[in-house]
């Protein structure tokens, strides 16, 4: 619509059907400033609504809250009663053979595979960012604000990530390890963890 209007006015100018009074008229300038603005607003409003609808997950099988601290992560499984833990990087001298240095944690995030997972992410002190590239997830953790993301793992495995927002001296020592397991394994893990934390 905008291109058609511009081409039409250009054709009229080339054919000299517009006088110099019309070419310099403020009415024409006002129209071709306001008309594109209206078209852009009409395009933006439905797009914003769709953008927020895409971010919402209707019925997740599991909701997990991640809280960034200097310099570790806390996790709360909000669908379970009193199921929460802190996740610290394992120091290199304590690392078992075969584990990745600077990437392994003492408590992994365990999730059921092939289940929609909603992550609610925040921070307790400074800006952090919960990022697991192999899951396609990177969400900022901001103090006083809850950010949300969702994902589904299609296979069992271990997925590594890290805080990707510079948050202080030990920023590089905030690894994230997500372990995707079949549902029966997840259920036994969660019941074992909730029993041991009581």
Curated annotation (Swiss-Prot):
<comment type="subunit">
    <text>Component of the cytochrome c oxidase (complex IV, CIV), a multisubunit enzyme composed of 14 subunits. The complex is composed of a catalytic core of 3 subunits MT-CO1, MT-CO2 and MT-CO3, encoded in the mitochondrial DNA, and 11 supernumerary subunits COX4I, COX5A, COX5B, COX6A, COX6B, COX6C, COX7A, COX7B, COX7C, COX8 and NDUFA4, which are encoded in the nuclear genome.</text>
</comment>
<dbReference type="InterPro" id="IPR014222">
    <property type="entry name" value="Cyt_c_oxidase_su2"/>
</dbReference>
<dbReference type="InterPro" id="IPR001505">
    <property type="entry name" value="Copper_CuA"/>
</dbReference>
<keyword id="KW-1278">Translocase</keyword>
<dbReference type="GO" id="GO:0004129">
    <property type="term" value="F:cytochrome-c oxidase activity"/>
</dbReference>
<dbReference type="InterPro" id="IPR002429">
    <property type="entry name" value="CcO_II-like_C"/>
</dbReference>
<feature type="binding site">
    <location>
        <position position="165"/>
    </location>
    <ligand>
        <name>Mg(2+)</name>
    </ligand>
</feature>
<dbReference type="Pfam" id="PF02790">
    <property type="entry name" value="COX2_TM"/>
</dbReference>
<feature type="binding site">
    <location>
        <position position="174"/>
    </location>
    <ligand>
        <name>Cu cation A1</name>
    </ligand>
</feature>
<keyword id="KW-0999">Mitochondrion inner membrane</keyword>
<dbReference type="InterPro" id="IPR034210">
    <property type="entry name" value="CcO_II_C"/>
</dbReference>
<dbReference type="GO" id="GO:0042773">
    <property type="term" value="P:ATP synthesis coupled electron transport"/>
</dbReference>
<keyword id="KW-0496">Mitochondrion</keyword>
<keyword id="KW-0479">Metal-binding</keyword>
<feature type="topological domain" description="Mitochondrial intermembrane">
    <location>
        <begin position="55"/>
        <end position="198"/>
    </location>
</feature>
<dbReference type="InterPro" id="IPR036257">
    <property type="entry name" value="Cyt_c_oxidase_su2_TM_sf"/>
</dbReference>
<dbReference type="InterPro" id="IPR011759">
    <property type="entry name" value="Cyt_c_oxidase_su2_TM_dom"/>
</dbReference>
<dbReference type="GO" id="GO:0005743">
    <property type="term" value="C:mitochondrial inner membrane"/>
</dbReference>
<feature type="transmembrane region" description="Helical; Name=II">
    <location>
        <begin position="27"/>
        <end position="54"/>
    </location>
</feature>
<feature type="topological domain" description="Mitochondrial matrix">
    <location>
        <begin position="14"/>
        <end position="26"/>
    </location>
</feature>
<feature type="binding site">
    <location>
        <position position="128"/>
    </location>
    <ligand>
        <name>Cu cation A1</name>
    </ligand>
</feature>
<protein>
    <recommendedName>
        <fullName>Cytochrome c oxidase subunit 2</fullName>
        <ecNumber>7.1.1.9</ecNumber>
    </recommendedName>
</protein>
<feature type="binding site">
    <location>
        <position position="167"/>
    </location>
    <ligand>
        <name>Cu cation A2</name>
    </ligand>
</feature>
<comment type="similarity">
    <text>Belongs to the cytochrome c oxidase subunit 2 family.</text>
</comment>
<dbReference type="Pfam" id="PF00116">
    <property type="entry name" value="COX2"/>
</dbReference>
<feature type="binding site">
    <location>
        <position position="171"/>
    </location>
    <ligand>
        <name>Cu cation A2</name>
    </ligand>
</feature>
<keyword id="KW-0679">Respiratory chain</keyword>
<feature type="binding site">
    <location>
        <position position="163"/>
    </location>
    <ligand>
        <name>Cu cation A1</name>
    </ligand>
</feature>
<keyword id="KW-0472">Membrane</keyword>
<feature type="binding site">
    <location>
        <position position="167"/>
    </location>
    <ligand>
        <name>Cu cation A1</name>
    </ligand>
</feature>
<keyword id="KW-0186">Copper</keyword>
<dbReference type="GO" id="GO:0005507">
    <property type="term" value="F:copper ion binding"/>
</dbReference>
<feature type="transmembrane region" description="Helical; Name=I">
    <location>
        <begin position="1"/>
        <end position="13"/>
    </location>
</feature>
<keyword id="KW-0249">Electron transport</keyword>
<comment type="function">
    <text>Component of the cytochrome c oxidase, the last enzyme in the mitochondrial electron transport chain which drives oxidative phosphorylation. The respiratory chain contains 3 multisubunit complexes succinate dehydrogenase (complex II, CII), ubiquinol-cytochrome c oxidoreductase (cytochrome b-c1 complex, complex III, CIII) and cytochrome c oxidase (complex IV, CIV), that cooperate to transfer electrons derived from NADH and succinate to molecular oxygen, creating an electrochemical gradient over the inner membrane that drives transmembrane transport and the ATP synthase.</text>
</comment>
<dbReference type="InterPro" id="IPR008972">
    <property type="entry name" value="Cupredoxin"/>
</dbReference>
<keyword id="KW-0813">Transport</keyword>
<feature type="binding site">
    <location>
        <position position="163"/>
    </location>
    <ligand>
        <name>Cu cation A2</name>
    </ligand>
</feature>
<keyword id="KW-0460">Magnesium</keyword>
<feature type="binding site">
    <location>
        <position position="165"/>
    </location>
    <ligand>
        <name>Cu cation A2</name>
    </ligand>
</feature>
<dbReference type="InterPro" id="IPR045187">
    <property type="entry name" value="CcO_II"/>
</dbReference>
<keyword id="KW-1133">Transmembrane helix</keyword>
